[in-house]
Swiss-Prot record:
EC number: 2.7.1.11
Residue sites binding ADP per the record: 21-25, 155, 186-188, 212, 214-216
Residues given in the record as substrate binding sites: 126-128, 163, 170-172, 223, 244, 250-253
Any Gene Ontology CC annotation: 6-phosphofructokinase complex
The organism's place on the tree of life at top rank: Bacteria
Listed pathway(s): Carbohydrate degradation; glycolysis; D-glyceraldehyde 3-phosphate and glycerone phosphate from D-glucose: step 3/4
InterPro entries per UniProt: ATP_PFK, ATP_PFK_prok-type, PFKA_ATP_prok, Phosphofructokinase_CS, Phosphofructokinase_dom, PKF_sf
Keyword tags: Allosteric enzyme, ATP-binding, Cytoplasm, Glycolysis, Kinase, Magnesium, Metal-binding, Nucleotide-binding, Transferase
Cofactors (names): Mg(2+)
One Pfam family in the UniProt entry: PFK
Protein name: ATP-dependent 6-phosphofructokinase
Its job: Catalyzes the phosphorylation of D-fructose 6-phosphate to fructose 1,6-bisphosphate by ATP, the first committing step of glycolysis.
Length: 319
């Protein structure tokens, strides 16, 4: 193997740049030519390639986002789109591909290998932390710290004004960020897709706490469970006073990655290159315990990552 490519796809996650840096520099150290694919799978189809040298990735570990840019590519979901991508790889003599992204990106990588025998290795990068067989995905720790910091600031104003704040965080199918952020900030309630919410019971809890002298409340809701406005409507009707809504939105994706995310991304990038050099394909790099391992992409994607209900109960008890 003499030439490989790397791309970032789907929603950006803090730490993607660190992974790109590791792939580029470790690849070059092992005698490989490394090509960067701009704009994810869209760039792969269009042939938007750039040769990456050692100096091109200097100083990017601490930067959020992705220097390669990213996209969500509908065309790549079609057989014709994947065929066009495979032709571009073969045209440019690229013998292996590292894909950094979430569930959709990794599914695309698997199909590219299955249909066109392209050696691919996936690196899980998504703030939802919803990829199976890996303890953590790149970007999760940074996102969690961003959310925690925002909630702590909201608690200051909630206390000053004696208000209930509803904080909506990302998580279309997974409540991981909401659960962990709610736990570490002492939120009065956490609403996640995995566990049904009883608004009457929730309102009773808030009113009970208020009678005990708790003058402010923080309710953390994952976007996939309900919108903050829906939660506010249900609660205001039952508790009899106005709430305030904060939707954190895309701020959760940005920012300089934490030390944990940098280390995770750098290690996964190195392992991805080693996997290609070892002749492996259609695998994802995963963190299991304190070890980095290679697992089949579809096995990871078909393994449902469940919420730790004990943590949910602990968060409820400690609120």
């Amino acid at each position: 193997m003499k030439k490989i490519a790397v791309l970032t796809s789907g929603g950006d996650a803090p730490g993607m740049n660190a992974a790109v840096r590791a792939v580029v520099r470790y690849g070059i150290k092992n005698g490989l030519e490394v090509i960067g694919v701009r704009r994810g799978y869209s760039g792969l189809i269009d042939g938007d390639f750039v040769k990456l040298e050692y100096k091109d990735v200097a100083g990017i570990t601490e930067k959020g986002g992705t220097i390669l840019r990213t996209s969500r590519c509908e065309e790549f979901k079609t057989e014709e789109g994947r065929e066009a991508a495979a032709k571009q790889l073969k045209k440019h003599g690229i013998e292996g591909l590292v894909v950094i992204g979430g569930e959709g990106s990794l599914t695309g990588a698997h199909l590219l290998h299955e249909e066109h025998n392209i050696p691919v290795v996936g690196i899980p990068a998504t703030i939802d932390n919803d990829i199976g067989l890996t303890d953590m995905c790149i970007g999760v720790d940074t996102c969690l710290n961003t959310v925690m910091d925002a909630i702590q600031k909201l608690k200051d104003t909630a206390s000053s004004h004696e208000r209930a704040f509803i904080v909506e965080v990302m998580g279309r199918h997974s409540g991981y960020i909401a659960l962990m952020a709610g736990l570490v900030t002492g939120a009065e309630a956490i609403i996640i897709p995995e566990i049904p919410v009883d608004y009457s019971q929730l309102a009773d809890r808030i009113l009970q706490e208020r009678r005990r002298g708790k003058i402010n409340s923080i309710i953390v809701v994952a976007e996939g469970a309900a919108s903050a406005y829906t939660v506010a409507r249900h609660l205001e009707y039952r508790i009899g006073y106005e709430t305030r809504i904060t939707i954190l939105g895309h701020v959760q994706r940005g920012g300089s990655p934490t030390a944990f995310d940098r280390r995770l991304a750098l290690s996964m990038g190195v392992e991805a290159v080693e996997a290609l050099l070892d002749g492996e394909a259609d695998v994802m790099i995963a963190l299991q315990g304190n070890k980095f391992v290679r697992v089949p992409i579809m096995e990871a994607l078909s393994t449902k990552k469940t919420i730790d209900k004990k943590l949910y109960e602990i968060a409820h008890l400690l609120s």
